[in-house]
Amino acid sequence: MDPTLSLNGDPNIGVYARVFEDLAVVPVEAPKEFRDKIAEALDVEVIETFVQGSSVIGLLLTGNSRGFVVSGLIQDSELEILQEYGDCLLLGEEMNAAGNVILTNDSFAVVHPDMSSAMREMVADFLKVKIIPMSFAGVGTVGMTCACTNTGVLLPARSTPEEIEKLERSIDDANVAIGTGSVNMGSGLIGTGLLINSKGYLAGNATTGYELGRIEDVFGFL
């Protein structure tokens, strides 16, 4: 299967969808071909909804096996759909684009360095993870700058050696591979162009063969 995908010609698939280990959340208007390819490549159930009445689900939603973290501006009908599949933590207006400011797996969550200590504690308690406030390549929106699973983290190519070393020390887990790369012909906003879990991945359709190779290497798909 071709490991690339677009949504109506837009390669920034991570802006519009959020993938978990057994579930993917996509916009209501996503074409059947888009939904079907995600279901097959990542071996997930696909649910359709909006968040805040918007299709930019990847920016507004994240989480791990313990539940969803989502913008506090989510509508009641949208929240009810998510709650059918897991518990939900709603972020307040201070920094509510959860998928933009949180990068998480089942062990740790890297968060925007300006996130308040109260919000960090709330996220840590809900997801049962260690909190790591950081930025990469000088960018604090870690949820869209990076991508991660329980076994790997892909950082933008312009991440500094100091940033990489700090993340390695903070995670302190030899079973989690850390590497750098890009998507969509050099974009450092990796999360905007990559949907990934332990079973597979899909990258934006502008992603080059070299970039696909880096993804497969870091996440162990080779």
UniProtKB/Swiss-Prot annotation:
SMART domains tied to this protein: eIF6
Listed Pfam families: eIF-6 (PF01912)
Keyword Protein biosynthesis: yes
UniProt-listed GO biological process terms: cytosolic ribosome assembly
Entry's transmembrane regions: none
Biological role stated in the UniProt entry: Binds to the 50S ribosomal subunit and prevents its association with the 30S ribosomal subunit to form the 70S initiation complex.
PANTHER family in alphabetical order: TRANSLATION INITIATION FACTOR 6 (PTHR10784)
Entry protein name: Translation initiation factor 6
Organism: Methanocorpusculum labreanum (strain ATCC 43576 / DSM 4855 / Z)
